[in-house]
């Protein structure tokens, strides 16, 4: 069966918020606009200083995040055509009844264009604020149950779970034109993939490091859907695909020397780096983005880590090359089932001169990908 492939666009939800390009994003080029939702960024503030990056001259902090649901509501009334997705709001910081209501609200504002993108949460956005992050997967599954229950019940409901209790709870807000917003989720672990197959309509991997890895995880999602009586092919396969785009080997070498690019290893689990033949500079137990916590990453530890980062390790794990090379690599993921890619050029984090060209490089890669896949 021939699948439709269309890229997605990112809209940064940090200050200063720029909504000036929404007309271009609403033009039909993109499948959807994706809005990240964080309290804390993946980049340590200890190296977000002019000493390490000139990006700090534009923004005093990498953590000036806005609420993605609120930004989505604004985007909903400023656009007419393109779907709008959170990528992703977690089910730790938000009660499922509020997620259910907010999703319906934004879907009405957008006239049926909202995608509720959810995830099980991350350390940096939960632990510093006192949220219980002890059983994120169980809470995630129960949240999806509650959202679906409130949406689909015509009468007040009771629910008793491990995390949530409802007594005569109702959500009488009807869906826009009789259709509930699709739920997409980001995940890679076996249990999460099974949950997504049961409850969700779209999927992003939290990590997929080869086309075969992507295909295997997508097979798990769709297999779960089929086992639970759902149409497996109705689940949209998406991916926030991180890469390094450079016009030359010389430019790539410059990008790899940038501290914020080196710090990308914080997001890579040690077990993944071992698969590519490299030790992780933070040790064998490092779990990637799940372990990012400002409290345990002081400046001294970050600086010591940067000294240990091997550029060859980043090149082994992260796809890289010219826009055309990037497109050819990404085509392998399309052949593995990917339908909605978002090309995320991490090279833009190398500094202002690289950030200035990043969007154009991504666009060139998108154009070449669409040419390759027809």
Where are these regions (language model features)?
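A structural motif
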Residues: 30, 110-111, 200-201, 338
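An alpha-helical appendage that flanks or caps ligand/catalytic pockets
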Residues: 134-172, 212-332, 372-374
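N-terminal beta1-alpha1-beta2 module of alpha/beta enzyme domains
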Residues: 1-78, 82, 181, 374
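Short, acidic/polar
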Residues: 15-25, 99-102, 186-195, 322-332
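Active-site mouth loops of central-metabolism enzymes
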Residues: 5-17, 87-97, 177-188, 243-246, ...
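Conserved, mostly hydrophobic/aromatic
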Residues: 37, 75, 106, 147, ...
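Glycine-rich, proline-tolerant flexible connector loops at the mouths of alpha/beta enzymes
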Residues: 34-65, 90, 122, 127, ...
């Amino acid at each position: 069966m021939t699948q439709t492939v269309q890229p997605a666009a990112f809209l940064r939800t940090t200050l200063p918020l720029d909504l000036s390009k929404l007309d271009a994003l609403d033009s039909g080029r993109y499948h959807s606009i994706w809005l990240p939702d964080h309290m804390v960024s993946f980049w340590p503030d200890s190296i977000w200083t002019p000493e390490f990056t000139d990006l700090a001259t534009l923004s005093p902090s990498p953590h000036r995040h806005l609420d993605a649901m609120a930004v989505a509501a604004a985007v909903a009334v400023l656009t007419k055509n393109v779907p709008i997705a959170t990528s992703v709001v977690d089910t730790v910081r938000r009660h499922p009844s509020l997620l259910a209501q907010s999703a319906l609200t934004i879907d009405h504002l957008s006239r049926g264009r909202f995608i509720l993108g959810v995830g099980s949460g991350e350390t940096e956005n939960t632990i510093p604020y006192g949220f219980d992050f002890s059983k994120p997967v169980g809470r995630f599954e129960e949240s999806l149950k509650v959202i679906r229950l409130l949406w689909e019940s015509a009468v007040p409901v009771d629910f008793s779970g491990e995390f949530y209790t409802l007594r005569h709870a109702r959500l009488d807000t009807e869906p826009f034109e009789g259709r509930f917003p699709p739920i997409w989720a980001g995940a890679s672990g076996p249990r999460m993939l099974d949950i997504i197959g049961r409850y969700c309509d779209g999927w992003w991997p939290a990590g997929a490091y080869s086309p075969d890895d992507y295909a295997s995880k997508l097979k798990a999602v769709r297999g779960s859907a089929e086992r639970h009586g759902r149409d497996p092919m109705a689940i949209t396969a998406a991916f926030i695909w991180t890469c390094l785009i450079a016009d030359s080997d010389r430019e790539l070498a410059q990008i790899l020397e940038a501290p914020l690019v080196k710090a990308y290893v914080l997001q890579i689990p040690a077990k993944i780096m071992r698969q590519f033949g490299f030790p992780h500079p933070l040790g064998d137990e490092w779990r990637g983005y799940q372990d990012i916590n400002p409290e345990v990453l002081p400046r001294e530890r970050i600086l010591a880590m940067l000294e240990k980062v091997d550029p060859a390790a980043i090149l082994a794990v992260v796809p890289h090359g010219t826009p055309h090379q990037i497109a050819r690599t990404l085509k392998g993921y399309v052949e593995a089932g990917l339908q909605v890619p978002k090309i995320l050029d991490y090279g833009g984090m190398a500094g202002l001169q690289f950030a200035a060209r990043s969007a154009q490089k991504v666009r060139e890669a998108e154009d070449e990908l669409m040419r390759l896949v027809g």
